[in-house]
């Protein structure tokens, strides 16, 4: 795995190749600034496969650098590990929103950093073996592109959408919040009804368009709330929100649905693309180990799926007073 490490501290730039070598990675290049890193990436004939970025650098910090790197097509999915002594939620949120894959704290825990590098290598290998055309670009309308969508189970990654990350990055985000002692997040899932029928009928572009419409509706419903979101396949989205906790998802669900209904989405031929969604009640994440984070994601999806089944048996009224924090 070819690694580029970026830090304005010469000592760190000497240390990182030694740590990487202990983890089995000998191909490490270094850059002393964001500008120098971008020059190296631009002029490198062989793409780097992992990037280590210090957040606290002068002129161009690591978060801004991460944003610039993600704008380079060949680096949209490259694992990016942020390096920093900063543990405030603001920096963690901004780093993952900019496209970070993982986060390592300074002063370095050597074992932890080796683990981060090995996980980045696993992710890089997995992505290389699962390349597919449906995630190469972001369709802007259902009239662009054709063909058959990827399998319904596939966690299609739609590029270029703010706060949308892959599931691995979402897991790492929650783990970093836990390591920094920052609580207060809650998780809920949104599920598209009859996703099998939409998937069976839609082209690649139409299916991506449908997924994007829901992402946009969720984002608008959340408003100014800080959040990260991941599409995990089968028409399900996981949302990690740092806003005020709500006991019931009914009002959130109604807001998302209203936004979708106002879009009047269509297939290529002008037929209506009717999208109905259900949202599960939120829950607190258990971030002690990765397995428990996965279990939390599964529980969130199960709640959304249970809501889908509940609505099949008839609507229930929205209780606005209980939707935001009044104990049941």
Set out the residue ranges of the language-model regions.
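Catalytic-site or vestigial catalytic-site microsegments of nucleotide-handling domains
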Residues: 180-200, 235
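Two-component/phosphorelay signaling modules centered on CheY-like receiver
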Residues: 10-30
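Receiver (REC) domain active-site loop signature in two-component systems and cognate sites
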Residues: 57-60
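CheY-like receiver
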Residues: 122-178
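Active-site residues of response regulator receiver
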Residues: 7, 54, 84
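Conserved helix-loop-beta segment at the catalytic/binding core of cyclic-nucleotide signaling proteins
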Residues: 215-245, 265-268
């Amino acid at each position: 795995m070819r690694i580029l490490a970026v830090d304005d501290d010469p000592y760190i730039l000497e240390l990182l190749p030694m740590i990487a070598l202990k983890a089995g990675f000998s191909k490490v290049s270094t850059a002393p600034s964001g500008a120098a890193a971008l020059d190296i990436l631009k002029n490198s004939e062989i793409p780097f496969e992992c990037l280590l970025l210090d957040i606290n650098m002068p002129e161009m910090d690591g978060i801004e650098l991460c944003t610039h790197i993600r704008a380079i097509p060949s680096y949209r999915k490259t694992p990016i590990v942020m390096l920093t002594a900063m543990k405030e939620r603001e920096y963690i949120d901004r780093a993952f929103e900019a496209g970070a894959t993982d986060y390592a704290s300074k002063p370095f825990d050597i074992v932890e950093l080796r683990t981060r590098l090995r996980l980045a290598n696993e992710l890089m290998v997995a992505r290389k073996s699962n390349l597919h055309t449906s995630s190469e670009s972001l369709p802007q309308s259902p009239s662009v592109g054709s063909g058959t969508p990827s399998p319904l189970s596939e966690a299609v990654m739609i590029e270029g959408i703010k706060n949308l990350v892959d599931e691995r990055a979402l897991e790492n985000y929650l783990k970093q919040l836990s390591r920094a002692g920052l609580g207060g997040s809650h998780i809920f899932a949104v599920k598209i009804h009859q996703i099998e029928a939409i998937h069976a009928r839609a082209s690649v572009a139409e299916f991506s368009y449908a997924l994007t419409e829901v992402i946009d509706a969720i984002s608008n419903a959340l408003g100014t709330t800080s959040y990260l979101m991941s599409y995990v396949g089968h028409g399900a989205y996981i949302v990690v929100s740092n806003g005020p906790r709500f006991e019931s998802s009914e009002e959130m669900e109604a807001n998302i649905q209203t936004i979708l209904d106002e879009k009047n989405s269509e297939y290529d031929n002008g037929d209506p693309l009717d999208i109905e969604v259900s949202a599960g009640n939120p829950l607190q994440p258990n971030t002690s180990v990765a397995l428990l984070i996965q279990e939390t994601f599964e529980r969130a999806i199960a709640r959304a799926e249970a809501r889908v089944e509940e609505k099949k048996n008839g609507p229930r009224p929205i209780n606005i007073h209980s939707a935001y924090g009044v104990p049941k």
